UniProtKB/Swiss-Prot annotation:
Keyword Isomerase on entry: no
UniProt binding sites for [4Fe-4S] cluster 3: C124, C144, C147, C150
Keywords, comma-separated and alphabetical: 4Fe-4S, Cell inner membrane, Cell membrane, Electron transport, Iron, Iron-sulfur, Membrane, Metal-binding, Repeat, Translocase, Transport
Protein name, as recorded: Ion-translocating oxidoreductase complex subunit B
Enzyme Commission number(s): 7.-.-.-
Signal peptide start-end: none
Stretches for region Hydrophobic: 1-23
Pfam family, one: Fer4_21
Coiled-coil ranges from the UniProt annotation: none
Residues bound to [4Fe-4S] cluster 2: C114, C117, C120, C154
GO CC field: plasma membrane
Subcellular location field: Cell inner membrane
Free-text function comment from the UniProt entry: Part of a membrane-bound complex that couples electron transfer with translocation of ions across the membrane.
Length: 186
């Protein structure tokens, strides 16, 4: 009775040691440049750049497959920060992708008009819209990134982008990085 238990324990220890060695030996490192670029992007996950989100866009920039000027939510400030980070010339913002918002915006649902079709919920990349089929929907203001992807799918046009008051009670966007923090990322 004791022999099978000891044999299985020994096999488990050997398999665990082999898996541990393989995890260390064959570890896949992430691209540190893509990590730095991703830290600069606004994380709206809007897809206006032509990629599925901010991380795929950062990986394309790091691989040299995409220009640094394709992020309308980040605006020209993000283009300048990316140019400084990568040591390239800043390009003007690609206006074909959309305009940079002058003030942060969030989605607002006119609940009296909402028919509960759930199309906006499916379109939201950050799950900032609450609701169920045939029920009214609402936007979690603190979670909304202002990408606007929920506006077009709405069949009754009850979703509007409204500016956010820029006071301390409503400020949910990351503060601008100073030069010291930027050097730590680099």
């Amino acid at each position: 009775m004791l022999t099978p238990i000891l044999a299985l324990t020994a096999l488990a220890l050997i398999a665990g040691a082999l898996l541990g060695f393989a995890a260390v030996r064959f570890r896949v490192e992430g691209n540190p440049i893509a990590d730095q670029v991703d830290a600069v992007l606004p994380q709206t996950q809007c897809g206006q750049c032509g990629f599925g989100g901010c991380r795929p866009y950062a990986e394309a920039i790091a691989a040299g497959e995409a220009e640094i000027n394709r992020c309308p939510p980040g605006g020209q400030d993000t283009v300048q920060t990316l140019a400084d980070l990568l040591g390239v010339e800043p390009l003007p913002l690609d206006e074909e992708r959309g305009e940079a918002p002058h003030t942060p915006q969030v989605a607002w649902v006119d609940e009296a008009v909402c028919i509960g079709c759930t199309r906006c919920i499916q379109a939201c990349p950050v799950d900032a819209i609450l609701g169920a089929a045939k029920q009214m929907h609402t936007v979690l203001k603190g979670e909304c990134t202002g990408c606007g992807l929920c506006v077009d799918p709405c069949p009754v046009d009850c979703i509007h982008m409204v500016p956010v008051d820029l006071d301390l009670a409503e400020w949910h966007w990351p503060l601008p990085q100073n030069d010291t923090a930027r050097r730590e990322v680099a």
